[in-house]
Curated annotation (Swiss-Prot):
Protein name: Large ribosomal subunit protein bL9
HAMAP family, per database record: Ribosomal_bL9
Lineage summary: Bacteria, Pseudomonadati, Pseudomonadota, Alphaproteobacteria, Hyphomicrobiales
Function: Binds to the 23S rRNA.
PANTHER family with a match to the protein in the record: 50S RIBOSOMAL PROTEIN L9
Biological source species: Brucella anthropi (strain ATCC 49188 / DSM 6882 / CCUG 24695 / JCM 21032 / LMG 3331 / NBRC 15819 / NCTC 12168 / Alc 37)
């Protein structure tokens, strides 16, 4: 099916372009959400009449998104989750969790704006891309840790999956003298 795009859609085209898409994608997503019109003569005339208004609305949304992007870009958000000793989470952190944390910090964000290729399943610092508008994207850091204290240590660059971080001990072997003394004690017994 051919449709006229009413806004820029990633991997599809710019506003005003006529593109061919699968029927199901057009009927179930583009047309119901008002992102496109069927490409026929009546709709082409209708679009040309509304083009200036649609471009003005798009520019306004883009400017709002850029204002939010200036505040949000480079921010760091802490997510506290329970995890095993090796840093593997019991569960995962999904787009919904990230959107909820960012929204709790005063930003309006929907989970479909968070771009995450796969759920996060380990503690650490993770870069996440947020799409505020088809033309405006920002990067935020999500700090996933077992506690806020660990999150602060992680933010300073400490690796919390090492043995020292897990058990609070240094990884130095015992000297040979300790073993010699134990052997002598066993021989005397």
């Amino acid at each position: 099916m051919e449709v006229i795009l009413l806004e820029r859609i990633g991997r599809l085209g710019q506003m005003g372009e006529t593109v061919k898409v699968k029927d199901g994608y057009a009927r179930n997503f583009l047309l119901p959400q008002g992102k496109a019109l069927r490409a026929n003569e009546a709709n082409k005339k209708k679009f040309e009449g509304q083009r200036a208004q649609l471009e003005a609305q798009n520019l306004e949304r883009k400017n709002e998104a850029q204002a939010v992007a200036e505040k949000l870009n480079g921010e760091s958000f802490i997510v506290v989750r329970s995890a095993g000793e090796t840093g593997q989470l019991y569960g995962s952190v999904s787009t919904r969790d990230i959107a909820d944390i960012i929204s709790a910090n005063g930003f309006t964000l929907h989970r479909n704006q968070v771009e995450l290729n796969h759920p996060i399943k380990a503690i650490g610092l993770h870069e996440v891309s947020i799409s505020l508008h088809p033309e405006v994207q920002v990067q935020v850091t999500v700090n996933i840790a077992r506690s806020t204290e660990e999150a602060e240590r992680q933010a300073k660059g400490e690796d919390l999956t090492s043995i020292e971080a897990i058990y609070g001990i240094e990884e130095q072997p015992l000297s040979e003298e300790v073993f010699d003394e134990e052997d002598e004690a066993e021989d005397q017994a």
